[in-house]
């Protein structure tokens, strides 16, 4: 009995082996690395939707309340002549809105007025101003630039001095060699004209 009591119990106080406590680090596979390194390409945003037939007193909040049930909206605008544009974040939401507008029983309506929803890339509505994002801005900027473009003075074109000299002295260097009746003037007549001009200025002074 004494031998059993004197026997040390080493198993109770010895710590567990490192191999049991920690698992060796396993390097990731090459396939997993390739998947992580590949850039995540986001799908391009779908084209905007054109909403036609809006009432005159329709607001942006009313238009948003009708179309946000089909998906998340990134941009919404109301243009003139009862036309608006709605841009969804996904193509599925835009297709659902178009399908909802084509339902014969319900459709999409504001103030009991049914709306027509089509893609902005539809050739039937491409000529409408402000259909796509930025198209209206480019047109208005081009129109305003044409209307507000300053008129360049004639001096920059080199015409003011010529016009003034032609009005004051019709028989100047520009019309040299041509007489008043359409014939060719001789050097003697041109010298007489110059002498007359000089005498006239001397009399004025």
Curated annotation (Swiss-Prot):
Region Disordered: start and end of each range? 1-42, 170-191
UniProt keyword annotations, A-Z: RNA-binding, Transcription, Transcription regulation
Here the segments flagged for biased composition (Basic and acidic residues) are 30-40
Q: Does the keyword Transcription regulation apply?
A: yes
Q: List the disulfide bonds.
A: none
The record's SUPFAM superfamilies line, in alphabetical order, gives: RNA-binding domain, RBD
Domain of life of the native organism: Eukaryota
CDD domains under this entry? RRM_SF
Q: Which Pfam families match?
A: RRM_1 (PF00076)
Coiled-coil positions are none
GO terms of molecular function: DNA-binding transcription factor activity; RNA binding
Compositional bias, Basic residues, is annotated for: 14-24
Q: Gene3D superfamilies given for it?
A: 3.30.70.330
Question: What InterPro entries does this protein map onto?
Answer: Nucleotide-bd_a/b_plait_sf (IPR012677), RBD_domain_sf (IPR035979), RRM_dom (IPR000504)
Looking at the record, the residues that make up the RRM domain are: 47-122
Protein name from the UniProt record: Uncharacterized protein At1g27050
This protein's species is Arabidopsis thaliana
Lineage, please? Eukaryota, Viridiplantae, Streptophyta, Embryophyta, Tracheophyta
């Amino acid at each position: 009995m004494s031998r059993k009591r004197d026997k040390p119990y080493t198993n109770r106080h010895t710590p567990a082996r490192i191999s049991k406590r920690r698992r060796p680090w396993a390097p990731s596979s090459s396939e997993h690395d390739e998947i992580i390194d590949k850039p995540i390409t986001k799908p391009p945003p779908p084209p905007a939707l054109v909403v036609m037939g809006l009432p005159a007193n329709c607001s942006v909040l009313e238009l948003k309340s009708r179309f946000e049930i089909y998906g998340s909206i990134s941009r919404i605008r109301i243009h003139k002549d009862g036309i608006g544009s709605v841009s969804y974040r996904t193509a599925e939401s835009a297709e659902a809105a178009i399908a909802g507008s084509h339902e014969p029983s319900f459709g999409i309506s504001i103030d009991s007025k049914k709306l027509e929803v089509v893609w902005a890339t539809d050739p039937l509505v491409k000529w409408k101003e402000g259909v796509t994002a930025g198209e209206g801005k480019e047109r208005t900027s081009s129109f305003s630039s044409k209307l507000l473009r300053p008129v360049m003075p004639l001096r920059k074109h080199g015409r003011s001095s010529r016009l003034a000299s032609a009005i004051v002295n019709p028989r100047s260097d520009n019309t040299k060699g041509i007489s008043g009746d359409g014939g060719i003037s001789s050097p003697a007549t041109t010298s007489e004209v110059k002498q007359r001009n000089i005498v006239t200025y001397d009399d004025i002074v």
